[in-house]
Amino acid sequence: MLHDMSENHEKSSSGAANGSSFNEDNERNHPDSEALSLPSSVAGSGTLDRLVDTARDYARAAASDNTLRAYAKDWAHFARWCRMKGADPLPPSPEMIGLYLADLASGSGPSPALSVSTIDRRLSGIAWNYAQRGFTLDRKNRHIATVLAGIKRKHARPPVQKEAILAKDILAMVATLPYDLRGLRDRSILLLGYAGGLRRSEIVSLDVGKDDTPGSGGWIEILDDGAVLTLNAKTGWREVEIGRGSSEQTCPIHALEQWLHFAKIDFGPVFVRTSRDGKKALEARLSDKHVARLIKTTVLKSGIRAELPEKDRLALFSGHSLRAGLASSAEVDERYVQKQLGHASAEMTRRYQRRRDRFRVNLTKAAGL
């Protein structure tokens, strides 16, 4: 079993499979290229062809870029596995998919066994790719459902949660940043992400104003008492209110205003790249990977969990640490935290609360024991 193969390796392997009618490179990079087209009975025209392109753009926008990239990798891995077994991924075969899931879980190849959540995500990616090609994958088919149920029963483990970044931690992290342009930007990212309980993709997709760019994931309105972020999030459009802090050193809105002022940004992406010397803001929007790297770098520099080896410290913290930190630190009614994080249920919010009082309601005593 092969895992996380490079693009070049995929292309060379695809080229080697001359007997296969399946062009993996095209399928991987354009998974929905044939999903939308003119009916065979309709003659093409310039107007209709343009509408097909427009419809394809909307179809791609149905999922986030990160999700699409993950689904593309899922399909590439499954397609290569099929070729290695002398099979074709098209049309869908529940029997082959059941064997594939078993291979992922057993770790019988050179790569280690995958977690249940990763296997479940792989299956979702494969099903999505089949749907884009006009096929339906029945996940309830016994060859798939029973194998997956057995994998979950045998290998399921409690989810490994990332460490929450608490208020004292975020202050120590921003204290490691310089006061050049790049430092102002990164300080704003950390404070805004923490106070808003934002996902890293939500942070970098923000624009200054509504409809500034085609790829916008939302915009910011700065007011006297704080800022309102309108986000096109996983659960749909939502508003996040971020109030001003108790001091300029810790205020996310002040940090944002400082960054926008000195970077001379009044239109387009809020968080952009800077020149090598950190003195000039460029036009290119930051990647969400920058947020993850920023968190890990500042965690190390600030000495958080210094008693642990560096490798363990890096593994403990991620973009989700900001969201978990807000949920764990904010001493307010749970429903306000739930709204801020955009959770559909209070139970999901509680999963983010790393230090909540689990025994505030003691049913043992309430039952008379």
For each of these PLM feature ranges, what is it?
Residues 245-312:
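Active-site/catalytic core of tyrosine-dependent DNA strand-transfer enzymes
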Residues 341-366:
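Catalytic-site neighborhood detector that most strongly recognizes the C-terminal catalytic loop/helix
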Residues 138-175, 233-235, 276-283:
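Flexible interdomain linker/hinge and immediately adjacent N-terminus
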Residues 205-253, 257-261:
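Conserved tyrosine-mediated DNA breakage-rejoining catalytic core shared by Y-recombinases
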Residues 168-200, 204, 252:
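Basic, Lys/Arg- and aromatic-enriched nucleic-acid-binding interface segment
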Residues 1-91, 99-102:
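Basic/aromatic DNA-contact patch characteristic of tyrosine site-specific recombinases
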Residues 52-66, 76-159, 176-179:
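N-terminal core-binding DNA-recognition domain of tyrosine recombinases/integrases
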Residues 191, 321-344:
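C-terminal catalytic core of tyrosine-transesterase DNA break-rejoin enzymes
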